[in-house]
Amino acid sequence: MNPPTNPRACSPLARAGSFAPIHVVGGGLAGTEAAWQIAQAGLPVILSEMRPVRQSPAHHTDQLGELVCSNSFGAAASDRAAGLLKEELRQLGSLVIATADCHAVPAGGALAVDRARFSQALTEAIQNHPRITLRREEVTEIPEGIAVLCTGPLTSDPLAKALQAFTGLEYLSFFDASSPIVTGDSLNRAVVFQASRYDKGEAAYLNCPMTEAEYERFWRALVEAEQAPLKDFEREERKFFEGCLPIEEMARRGKDTLCFGPLKPVGLVDPRTGSRPYAVVQLRQEDKAGQLWNLVGFQTNLKWGEQQRVFRLIPGLEQAEFVRFGVMHRNTFLNSPQLLWPTLQFRRRPTLFAAGQLVGTEGYACAVAGGWLAGQNAARLALGLPLITLPPETMMGSLFQFISSADPRHFQPMPANFGLLPDLEGRKLRNKQERYGRYRDRALAALKTTGLVRQVQTA
């Protein structure tokens, strides 16, 4: 079923003054981008940001688009997933990415910014736009009319409760306990085998069998690995983590604890030996194409480098390519596959949009992409124009297709990665650089067919 446009919307030829303002809630990267796109479409916008009236535990200023973690937007090269996403946004006229480009600082192969100048420039752009009204206020209820929610991982309690009431408690998460995801073509298929326990149902899992010696080596590395520190406000709110124990904490309870938990081998036979392994790590399919696989039960708070080192000790994962590392942190996000269309509209209320980390995307550029799409579509809904869904060959199109169609039982936030894209036609390219270049070329060609690409204006 396709998302509807508003049949009562005004004609696109109507005067901008005849439109009610579209309300954007949240002045982070997604909200700033959404407000800009709506205003650039000729429509009035109210952008509500609660800082400094109410400060979040992670922010330090009242500037829009404040970068609370790293100052890096990820890889700059367009043959990298994060770089391709940013290039798509450049071609689509993103304010945030253009501002990042203007305030870039040397960072090797990444796009990093002077965070103070970057946020100041975004704030000035929004304040100076004649169609944007910036309100410093806390929004405690979901706005009426056409609105875009971009309140991020630290959504304030009153609005979070309103979202709970609107979506249903089970569709809103308050912490992110994610397992790592690896690409299917990086697995050692000579070791990994496909099966379900006791051969019940379809063979839905990939299984990495371990001998006792392999398990002991893995267990010892796991309990000795270095964990990522929690932020102060996360340490104060440990209740968010009680429902999902990190695998390294489980391992510390005893050498064999994992063998009776997520690594239990019961009901599985290693076809190489004809017998039950000592332990088994199971991988669950994340996408329809079978390109992304989740390490079941491996929610973790290990540092990312440690995750790669330790988890590559698992037989079959020696050369595993990680598209997402496990995380455990405070993060309010929606079960988007149950709630949203790829247009970022709520299924039960098409005049309400959401974007940013709230919808279950991960990373700065992904937040900007969500803001761009939600802003564009909110404006189009008001104008009575067809709404946008970008081609699945593009990074943006594949990302929002994923978050609106993934298995809702296991949904966790997802970053941009090439595993989301459809397979390339023709023979499989073994050279990763060549393969990623082909993905880029196909994505940018598909983007041009939409008619949305804007001419880059030189200064």
Curated annotation (Swiss-Prot):
It is an enzyme of class 2 (transferase). It is found in: Cytoplasm. Its main location: cytoplasm. Its cofactor is FAD. Pfam families: GIDA (PF01134). One of its GO terms (biological process) is tRNA methylation. Keywords: Cytoplasm, FAD, Flavoprotein, Methyltransferase, NAD, NADP, Transferase, tRNA processing. Catalyzes the folate-dependent formation of 5-methyl-uridine at position 54 (M-5-U54) in all tRNAs. Belongs to the MnmG family. TrmFO subfamily. This is Methylenetetrahydrofolate--tRNA-(uracil-5-)-methyltransferase TrmFO. The gene is trmFO.
